[in-house]
Amino acid sequence: MGRLFGTDGVRGVANRELTAELALALGAAAARQLASGSAPGRRVAVIGRDPRASGEMLEAAVIAGLTSQGVDALRVGVLPTPAVAYLTGAYDADFGVMISASHNPMPDNGIKIFGPGGHKLDDGTEDRIEALVGDAGPRPVGAGIGRVIDAEDAADRYLRHLSKASTLRLDGLTVVVDCAHGAASAVAPRAYRAAGARVIAINADPNGLNINDNCGSTHLDSLRAAVVAHRADLGLAHDGDADRCLAVDADGNLVDGDHIMVVLALAMREAGELASDTLVTTVMSNLGLHLAMRSAGITVRTTGVGDRYVVEELRAGDFSLGGEQSGHIVMPALGSTGDGIVTGLRLMTRMAQTGSPLSDLASAMQTLPQVLINVTVADKATAATAPSVQTAVGQAAAELGDTGRILLRPSGTEPMIRVMVEAPEKDIAQRLATRVAEAVSAAR
């Protein structure tokens, strides 16, 4: 069996790859690894979930694993992933667990684990947890068994935390927020209204089955239409667990994570809040971001794909802003992981501060045409390293020279290779990406 942990926890189709038995074993293993060195007294883990149908089943299984190892489960209910990360620190818990598959379709689910303070685990800690899966070890009895506690104040605590993200009132701004029928549904509209914005919420009625269904950050058509119809100043789209945020301007044009990072980096540098005048992003960020930051005198640090690697670089360099093109934006002063609602509040704060429409702010970066093709493969390692694929990549890179770039990346959560090409013209990017994707497909 391959490694359980991917780039963002353990994922799979609920009740197929991600079974209740596996969830119980992961809960027990996490308890043994992360709570073993705790100070004397009750050991506590925060646990939350998004609203997809399988969440309650997996939550019950994880709780069984936690409590079987003597760890109390502090249940916060349906809340965003960044809320669980924040509350892990706020409640001074030993660790936290979030049950969500983020932007993935409803049949999928996942288990993310946060260490003390709400930080994502490093690879070594994940490996040690994985080694304990299926090895229950000694189990407590009687009063030593963990208890289940409902955290009634969890949502209010998180909302108070969110209020720190907006440093001035947002009165006069109208925003459409797409909650993806996910974990943001109950809290994002409240947070934006509390900051003063006029809020029109769409796709905010989760029933367990409709999460991410033609809505949210991966399907922007309904958001674009609503922004134009309501003559809103902007639209914000969250995914199923609200750890990411994408935006559209008043005309419905996409403002992706790269543009959001540029807007926030310039704002933070102006305020003296951009530590070391440095932005941290991943290899997937558009070359246009690098050019915009270079012209502004801002250094860009690049990491592998995944917000956990962005966070690791932020912590290592004591930097203050990082993120991904997909809309995971991390500001350590406001949270230990990406928070889509914090991002939305900061973006609107910049609009209110400058009086500028989002389209003007986003124009600080010019996007180079980019083509991304996902190729399903049986073996990611074999397909990516096949000689025919390497030849195709080399030929494409030679043709681009320094006018663009090509990136071949195995997905961390799905059986596919992502082929990304940026070029001066869209047709060039499409032609080269298609050529490389065909080579990958033939080698799979």
From Swiss-Prot:
Q: Which gene encodes it?
A: glmM
Pfam families for this protein: PGM_PMM_I (PF02878), PGM_PMM_II (PF02879), PGM_PMM_III (PF02880), PGM_PMM_IV (PF00408)
Q: Does the entry feature the keyword Oxidoreductase, yes or no?
A: no
InterPro entries associated with the record:
A-D-PHexomutase_a/b/a-I (IPR005844), A-D-PHexomutase_a/b/a-I/II/III (IPR016055), A-D-PHexomutase_a/b/a-II (IPR005845), A-D-PHexomutase_a/b/a-III (IPR005846), A-D-PHexomutase_C (IPR005843), A-D-PHexomutase_C_sf (IPR036900), A-D-PHexomutase_CS (IPR016066), Alpha-D-phosphohexomutase_SF (IPR005841)
| Similarity field | Belongs to the phosphohexose mutase family.
Q: Which cofactor does it need?
A: Mg(2+)
Reactions the enzyme catalyzes? alpha-D-glucosamine 1-phosphate = D-glucosamine 6-phosphate
Q: Which UniProt keywords apply?
A: Isomerase, Magnesium, Metal-binding, Phosphoprotein
Q: Which is one GO molecular function term here? A: magnesium ion binding
| Residue positions, PTM Phosphoserine | 102
Modifications after synthesis and translation: Activated by phosphorylation.
Classification via HAMAP family: GlmM_B (MF_01554_B)
Gene Ontology terms: biological process: carbohydrate metabolic process; peptidoglycan biosynthetic process; UDP-N-acetylglucosamine biosynthetic process
Q: Which domain of life is it from?
A: Bacteria
**Residues annotated as catalytic:** 102 (phosphoserine intermediate)
What does the UniProt record say this protein does? Catalyzes the conversion of glucosamine-6-phosphate to glucosamine-1-phosphate.
Binding-site residues, Mg(2+): 102, 239, 241, 243
List the Gene3D superfamilies.
Alpha-D-Glucose-1,6-Bisphosphate, subunit A, domain 3 (3.40.120.10), Alpha-D-phosphohexomutase, C-terminal domain (3.30.310.50)
- Co-factor note (free text): Binds 1 Mg(2+) ion per subunit.
Which GO terms of the cellular component aspect does the record hold?
Answer: cytosol
Kindly provide the name given to this protein in its UniProt entry: Phosphoglucosamine mutase
Q: What is its EC number?
A: 5.4.2.10
Q: Does the keyword tRNA processing apply?
A: no
